[in-house]
A protein has these predicted regions:
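A generic beta-sheet turn/junction motif
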Residues: 6-10, 19, 42-46
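Long hydrophobic segments that form regular secondary structure
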Residues: 133-138
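A common structural microfeature
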Residues: 12, 127, 139-143
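Transmembrane beta-strand segments that form the barrel wall of outer-membrane beta-barrel proteins
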Residues: 17-23
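Periplasmic plug
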Residues: 14-16, 50
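Surface-exposed loop/interface segments of Gram-negative outer-membrane beta-barrel transport/assembly proteins
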Residues: 1, 24-29, 35-125, 143-244
Length: 244
């Protein structure tokens, strides 16, 4: 983390940033987080302005093989051959392989993890908050605030056609790609007038008048494709068709 500030009594500024890399429980679960902000404060007479801009960038890399698949692969299954080769299928407890009974087939999670599959996402967000405070008289206080935020996210998941889940799928439908994008936009603000005065050291009058505005919008788009050739052909341009 880093934060630097300076200025004078009338004008203050500060900017900072932070970076954090979080390793998940599973080896391929990684989260990179970057945050930055710029703070400005300006005072002139009875008027005070302040503005804060925040930027957040997050990248996720998720395991392509869920923990449940590793848990399903019982410890007595040999995950590699004596030569250290990772095979596609695990042994059966009776050491008989019968592709005719797909319900008995147990895929090797190490095989699936070594393929060109990926599950990743990224997020970018920016927010600006503006504040105004004005006290023209001792008995009158005016405060205004306005904030606007924009956030975009993109999630991509590709599963290789060589993955065990496609073993019983026809050739032109093996492999899948999914992309989901979302845009969020929002703003909110409020204005408050506060009046308070004492008359004749005995009577007090207080009044508050306020108004607020806000709006939120979200747009989501998705795209899917199936049917990929074997190898490192992981973009939708190599797909065969849209899913049925």
């Amino acid at each position: 983390n880093l934060y630097v500030e300076g200025g004078s009594e009338q004008f203050r500024y500060g900017f900072g940033g932070s970076y954090n890399k979080i390793q998940g429980v599973m080896k391929s679960s990684i989260r990179d987080i970057f945050s930055g902000n710029l703070d400005l404060l300006y005072r002139v007479g009875k008027l005070t302005f302040s503005n804060k801009i925040s930027v957040d960038v997050t990248k996720y890399t998720n395991p392509v093989v869920p923990f449940s698949e590793y848990a399903h692969a019982n410890p007595y299954y040999p995950k590699r051959t004596v030569d250290g080769i990772v095979e596609k299928w695990l042994e059966y407890k009776d050491n008989e392989f019968s592709a005719t009974d797909a319900s008995e087939i147990v895929g090797n999670p190490l095989w699936n993890a070594a393929l060109s599959s990926y599950d990743k996402s990224k997020m970018f967000g920016v927010r600006n908050n503006f504040n105004l405070e004005y006290r023209p008289f001792d008995f009158l206080y005016i405060r205004g605030r306005f904030g606007v935020a924009k956030q975009t996210s993109d999630s991509e998941r590709f599963t290789s056609p060589e993955a065990t889940e496609f073993d019983q799928v026809e050739l032109l439908k093996k492999g899948s790609y999914n992309d989901v994008r979302r845009d969020d936009f929002s703003y909110d603000g409020d204005l408050t007038l506060t009046y308070g005065q004492i008359f004749n050291d005995a009577h007090q009058i207080n009044a508050v008048l306020g108004m607020s505005i806000s709006e939120r919008k979200s747009i989501s788009k998705g795209f899917s494709a199936v049917g990929f050739p074997e190898g490192n052909y992981t973009t939708p341009g190599f797909s065969n068709k849209y899913p049925d």
